[in-house]
């Protein structure tokens, strides 16, 4: 685990005076471009992975490996929303370098501490790369969709029927603290990946998995309906009491994982059930807003957000933009929230000697003295999502997506060795193969990655 101390390099980056200030007009594209350029530069000040002796793709201490995956996802969004390719080469190198020996984002250097949620943040980045038509790697390199499928496959193979009648544990390996905990970010991650793969590939088996995970989360209470229109996502539950007691902390990123996952499924299926679920989670997200401006309700009020939690609004901002792209009825509300939050975030980016270091609190019309990768990432995401309705929604394999897939990715089974299956023409991701790979493993409870 990384020590929670700031490196000298990070401090010097914070103090490096450029003399530029961040001014934002949410209605002016050039203003948005200039603001996000400053913020992206500030985010990349924390990255030294391409320097001699450093690790490609990893950010400086004290930021864990998973947050690097989150940060590269923000840089990918920056490329897409702002149409700025400044960091594309670094992004490609990092996503490929950290894929690991099995090309499933379980690199040996991280596996002693890696959890299911950690793996997911890299998987989400490559899923977005496929959906956004980010330039494909050379043909002899792993491809974005195949990498995303590998993340899904390896996570699904860890589905644990031996405790609580299903669900993913937080941790992959039994020696890590939290192995006994089944939490919403890990299960929500599997749901979210299944939802996005459903839409991208058209493969109904991914939808079956999304339904399985959602139903399990609802069954144990991680997803709860506390009022008819109020859907909440609690943090987790413990297998030691058979998942009967809930940790009722609520976090923006957990809520957003489920909300956006529902939006992806609705957009693909047009099923009114998923439509209503999307809108209910959106309505319930008001718990994370004050005067239409985002805040991290689980920790910000007590001024005790840790380094990880300071990045959560970044992912929620991303999920808001995706939901708006996919569900038209959500747009009026989401655009209002994004505009107000972007203005608050811009006001917070007024600190440090450079004059545009971002803080955590977007409610005070100024800098709160906080700074870090998470704060910078969150401000970048909310401001660039001002353009969420100005850019195309995520592509699919049926409407322009070009990333090649591999439904056997991440498994020990080669696709060519599986029995022939009826795969619909046009489903380039290989609908049906996933059934043989994951369905049989699920029935056998083959938890092959859990030691």
Swiss-Prot record:
Residue ranges annotated as propeptide are 428-451
List GO BP terms, alphabetically.
budding cell bud growth; carbohydrate catabolic process; cell wall organization; fungal-type cell wall biogenesis
Instruction: Give the protein name, as stated in the record.
Output: Mannan endo-1,6-alpha-mannosidase DCW1
Location in or out of the cell? Secreted, Cell wall; Cell membrane
Cite the SUPFAM superfamilies for this sequence: Six-hairpin glycosidases
What residue spans carry the region label Disordered? 397-419
* Alphabetically ordered keywords of this record: Cell membrane, Cell wall, Cell wall biogenesis/degradation, Glycoprotein, Glycosidase, GPI-anchor, Hydrolase, Lipoprotein, Membrane, Secreted, Signal
Q: Name one GO cellular component term.
A: side of membrane
Q: Its function?
A: Required for normal synthesis of the cell wall.
Q: Give the gene name.
A: DCW1
Say yes or no: keyword Glycoprotein present: yes
